[in-house]
A protein has these predicted regions:
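Histidine-acidic metal/acid-base catalytic patches
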Residues: 1-23, 28-32, 57-58, 64, ...
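Residue-level recognition of beta-strand->loop/alpha-helix junctions
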Residues: 27-28, 74, 150
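N-terminal small/glycine-rich loop or linker at the start of catalytic domains
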Residues: 35, 70-81, 115, 231-238
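A generic secondary-structure micro-motif detector
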Residues: 2, 48-49, 87, 125, ...
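A short, structure-level motif marking secondary-structure boundaries and short turns
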Residues: 43-45, 81-83, 119-121, 239-242
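Active-site acidic/histidine proton-transfer and metal-coordination neighborhood
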Residues: 17, 56-69, 78-186, 196, ...
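Glycine-rich, proline-tolerant flexible connector loops at the mouths of alpha/beta enzymes
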Residues: 25-59, 119
């Protein structure tokens, strides 16, 4: 719901209901200045949910009244940033979001695994071992699933080098799932990120079918003339652009067919960035 910045929770839910949406992935950022696009939006105050039973009851009752399910509480920071102060703040708020997800009966949190941009992949995997076990333990205690989106968070020079999210490819997924062997950790699957990384976006659905907890519908358009000029080492936004489903390069028939094949029956949310 980050696309509806400035709207109240009630306005957002009313709009979703009027437009016929069955579910929404609700932004739950803390009150802070946004450092990037779509960050800093909060339609549910996670900390208040945990402290105020009346507020929590209102959130649940309004969703029921609107006839719109909350698919997940969404918070997408970089919990492995090299900035220790920002890292600790992000971890603490993520824990609050997990607790709020339990209290609201949502049972799902969507987020990033994060990445220290001063370290390589192997060093970041070591950092996963250090940072994530207590978070996963809390999720297990709360019976909340954590779905990591496969977005590299690498678009322009502000996310260079390496991007701000480690968990972006099937080989890295395999490594992370070995380190964090938990039924409560899975994937928020977005096919569009694989398009510009030149990765097969269908095959991983079959291999990781038991780890697909949540799904995004977002498209990416590759501008071949630009790619052939600047090459794959350029900033991604120099040769691609996010699109709403149907206006990019994802084959939605194949994608939905694969989701049907694996028996996925969870929520699918349209992510709008264009």
């Amino acid at each position: 719901t980050s696309i509806l910045d400035g709207w109240t929770y009630e306005q957002m839910m009313d709009f979703a209901s009027e437009q016929g949406f069955e579910c929404v992935e609700v932004a739950c950022w803390p009150e802070e200045k946004a450092e990037r696009r779509y960050a800093g939006v909060s339609h549910i105050d996670a900390e208040r949910v945990n402290q105020d039973d009346e507020y929590a009851a209102h959130i649940m009752a309004y969703a029921e009244k609107a006839g719109v399910e909350i698919s997940a509480l969404a918070y997408y920071p970089n919990v492995m940033t090299a900035d220790k102060e920002k890292r600790n703040a992000a971890i603490e708020h993520l824990k609050n979001v997990i607790r709020a997800s339990k209290k609201l009966g949502v049972g799902m949190v969507t987020t990033f695994i994060g990445r220290d941009q001063t370290k390589n992949v192997r060093e970041n995997l070591e950092l996963v071992k250090e940072i994530w076990p207590p978070i996963i333990k809390l999720a297990e205690v709360c019976d909340v699933k954590i779905a990591i989106e496969n977005c590299p968070m690498l678009f322009g020079e502000e996310q260079w080098p390496g991007g701000q999210n480690l968990m972006t490819t099937p080989p890295i997924w395999r490594e992370v799932f070995k380190i964090l062997d938990s039924d409560n950790l899975g994937i928020n699957y977005d096919p569009s990120h694989f398009i510009w990384q030149m990765i097969d976006y269908i095959r991983p659905l079959y291999e990781f079918k038991d780890k697909i907890f949540h799904v995004h519908y977002k498209d990416i358009k590759i501008y071949r003339d630009k790619l052939e000029s600047c090459g794959i080492m350029a900033y991604p936004l120099e040769y691609m652009s996010p699109k709403i489903p149907g206006l990019g390069d994802v084959d939605w028939g194949k994608y939905v067919s694969a989701l049907t094949d694996i028996g996925y029956d969870g929520c699918t949310c349209i992510e709008i960035e264009d």
